[in-house]
């Protein structure tokens, strides 16, 4: 998105720092929440229903999807068989409950265990309920025009929920307005989706066709830098659940890069849903790159993901030119919300450099 924004400057999906600071910050917070927090419950939904003996099961669907990669050019059933072989060889899927590997081990490392799984699902459902109410009034996150926040949310909600048969069915049954938004934001055909830029027509008094904007809020973000009240419960999830974990992650990563175990400039664990090979001892158990966290009143432990620290630095840079006096009162409604304004200082001792898909301390 950053690359596309730089190349196509006509109509931005990122609100301007000076004229729309609250909306700008809100979109970056939503991107981070969706990409790195909602994804935990999304991965659970993806893999739980692929385990042996689960009912309902979307194992065959997942095998077919992965088989498209590992069985290119083969017949349909041969592709599915290729996906099934990969699941067994790489993930040991038939023994996922007794000897978790691959994404099944990754869920534990991300803090989604038998003890915390209900809390993760409850958190996800609260977010979906809030979004269902929000999309009753607004077609996109900030009104009638898509933003970075929409595309951030689209990642897990489209790929892991909407497309997968089991969670996708539940999404359609319980959150149909969220489904409409998925189709609208992804540019798919849907009678009620009202895509951005679409016009609706009616017959005027003189018999001519009269066009009007097809999306809510006159096809634009809300005026005067307003963030919809219906979006507040979603943003509150960031501050109540994710932000305490991120603060602990910053401190843990700083201790590690300043320790004798690491030399500045060396490689760090990558963005992944499992502990990075070579860093397993650090990112599992009581390793130096694990921290305690809490979700839904349940305390547990999970791995630190340096990519999230890189994303926080990106957020800090994005709001550097924003008017703090306009942001502070808005942030005050969230638990410890104003701490975001001191993000650059908090990250001073733990900078992360990204080179392609690799991460290094800086």
Located regions from the model:
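All-alpha helical catalytic cores of prenyl diphosphate-utilizing isoprenoid enzymes
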Residues: 83-103, 114-131, 151
């Amino acid at each position: 998105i950053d690359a596309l924004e730089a190349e196509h400057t006509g109509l931005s999906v990122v609100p301007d720092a000076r004229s729309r600071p609250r909306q700008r910050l809100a979109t970056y917070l939503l991107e981070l929440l969706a990409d790195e927090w909602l994804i935990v419950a999304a991965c659970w939904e993806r893999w739980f229903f692929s385990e042996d003996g689960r009912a309902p099961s979307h194992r065959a669907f997942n095998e077919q999807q992965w088989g498209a990669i590992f069985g290119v050019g083969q017949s349909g059933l041969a592709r599915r068989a290729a996906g099934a072989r990969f699941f067994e060889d790489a993930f040991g899927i038939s023994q996922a409950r007794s000897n978790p590997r691959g994404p099944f081990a990754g869920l534990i490392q991300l803090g989604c265990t038998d003890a915390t799984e209900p809390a993760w699902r409850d958190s996800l459902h609260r977010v979906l309920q809030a979004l269902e109410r929000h999309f009753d009034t607004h077609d996109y996150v900030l009104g009638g025009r898509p933003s970075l926040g929409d595309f951030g949310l689209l990642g897990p909600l489209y790929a892991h929920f909407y497309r997968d048969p089991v969670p996708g069915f539940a999404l359609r049954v319980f959150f149909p307005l969220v489904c409409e938004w998925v189709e609208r934001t992804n540019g798919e055909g849907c009678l009620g989706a009202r895509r951005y830029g679409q016009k609706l027509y009616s017959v005027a008094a003189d018999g001519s066709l009269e066009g009007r904007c097809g999306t809510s809020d006159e096809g634009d973000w809300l005026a005067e830098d307003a963030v919809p009240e219906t979006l507040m419960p979603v943003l509150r999830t960031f501050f109540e659940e994710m932000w305490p974990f991120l603060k602990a992650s910053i401190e843990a990563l700083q201790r590690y890069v300043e320790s004798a175990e690491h030399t500045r400039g060396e490689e760090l664990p990558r963005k992944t849903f499992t502990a990075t090979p070579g860093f397993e001892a650090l990112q599992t158990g009581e390793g130096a790159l694990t921290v305690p966290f809490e979700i839904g009143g349940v305390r547990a432990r999970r791995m630190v993901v340096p990519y999230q620290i890189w994303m926080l630095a990106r957020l800090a840079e994005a709001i550097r030119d924003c008017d703090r006096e306009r942001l502070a009162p808005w942030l005050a409604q969230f638990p410890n919300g104003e701490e975001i304004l001191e993000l650059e200082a908090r990250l001073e001792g733990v900078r992360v450099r990204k080179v392609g898909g690799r991460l290094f301390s800086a």
